[in-house]
Regions:
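NAD(P)H-binding glycine-rich loop region in Rossmannoid oxidoreductase-like domains
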Residues: 53-93
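Catalytic helix-loop patch of NAD(P)-dependent Rossmann-fold dehydrogenases
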Residues: 85, 92-100, 115-118, 126-177, ...
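Non-catalytic, hydrophobic alpha-helical segments
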Residues: 228, 232, 247, 258, ...
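Rossmann-fold cofactor-recognition segment
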Residues: 43-54
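Amphipathic terminal alpha-helices
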Residues: 2-3, 306-321
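NAD(P)-dependent short-chain dehydrogenase/reductase
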Residues: 131-138, 162-221, 225-234, 252, ...
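C-terminal "lid/loop" region of Rossmann-like NAD(P)-dependent oxidoreductases
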Residues: 210-211, 215, 242-245, 254-260, ...
Length: 321
């Protein structure tokens, strides 16, 4: 049985992925520090423990003791806005935490001849930053896109990405870099899918139909976390060490489609009210990426956005009951 260790198991992706790995025959252990989801909802048979990735000594001890076959590194300060407020913390977690993990793997390989785990680090499309303005729907950015991050979070993820490449080139660590575009899951609440779904539940209970919105003209590709899980599994099976892979939905649509899908799921015809507070100072008209590289490994996207928002709406309907 292949042993997997997942950092950031208390996050949206991590909480889904530990269960997905178990269903696919892995022995799974996950760590968390400041969960952004309710970890009580995770399958209780999966071992979870608390670990701050900034605690390099504890990480060193854990990797050397457990010797996982594959490590999925999700743990991060993962929001751009807080990265402006506290760039020090963002760098300590995202950059320092990655260095600590890679150093732990390097030490374990030295102490245990023949031990050679895969390290799959989840970076972000935010590393492309300002370069994305040069692309169109007919010419989406692939993994050769320049790295021009526009905020401390993006810079920290670019550093994580490049550190993995450096440890691969210099020490032979089987590091794979994931450049993840927009992704959502049923238990994520701080994005348009979760926010709209939660408010739709609240409106349904009071007979309301006024939905406050921001910019709905922007085009996005929003991946279902269940499709992300299958992509990450394929990378353990077939991904090449040292390589970077974009992961993004191939379904690109304006944000008006979110409202249309929510109306289909809820049966509510929403009256849209523009709220200046929901508009971003800078909002990219298009945010999507080219995923031909991972598709060549056999990854197939299965879920439509309607499936995603229905699962999210039903989740918050139960959660807020």
């Amino acid at each position: 049985m292949r042993k997997a260790y997942v950092t950031g198991a208390g996050g949206v992706v991590g909480s889904h992925f530990v269960e997905y790995l178990k269903r696919n025959g892995y022995e799974v252990v996950g760590s968390y520090f400041t969960p952004t989801t309710d970890i009580a909802e995770i399958d209780p048979s999966i071992k979870l423990f608390e670990l701050d990735v900034r605690d390099h000594a504890k990480m060193m001890d854990w990797i050397g003791e457990y010797l996982p076959d594959v490590i999925y590194h999700f743990a991060a300060q993962s929001r751009p806005v807080p990265s402006w407020d506290d760039p020090y913390y963002t760098m300590e977690v995202n950059v320092g935490g990655t260095v600590g993990l890679l150093e732990a793997v390097k030490a374990a390989r030295a102490a245990h001849p023949g031990y050679d785990p895969k390290v799959i680090a989840i970076s972000s499309s935010a590393i492309y930053g300002d370069a994305l303005k040069n692309y169109t729907v007919d010419n989406l950015p692939d993994e050769t896109c320049p790295l021009l991050p526009l905020h401390p979070y993006g810079v920290s993820k670019a550093a994580e990405d490049l550190l993995c490449y450096q440890y691969y080139k210099n020490f032979g660590i089987q590091a794979i870099r994931i450049r993840l575009f927009n992704c959502t899951g049923k238990n994520k609440d701080q994005d348009i899918t979760g926010d709209f779904a939660k408010r739709a539940v609240e409106l349904s209970r009071i007979g309301g139909n006024v939905l406050r919105v921001g910019n709905l003209s922007a085009k996005r590709a929003i991946l279902d976390v269940r499709d992300l899980c299958s992509a990450l599994l394929i990378l353990d099976q077939k991904g090449a060490a040292g390589e970077a892979y974009n992961i993004c939905s191939s379904h690109i649509f304006p944000m008006t489609h979110v409202v249309e899908c929510l109306e289909q799921v809820t049966g509510i015809h929403f009256v849209l009210e523009r709220d200046p507070k929901l508009f971003r100072p800078a909002d990219e008209p298009l945010y999507a990426g080219n995923c031909d590289k991972i598709k060549a490994l056999g990854w197939v996207e299965k879920y439509q956005y309607t499936d995603t928002i229905e699962a999210t709406y039903q989740y918050w309907k139960r959660k807020l009951a």
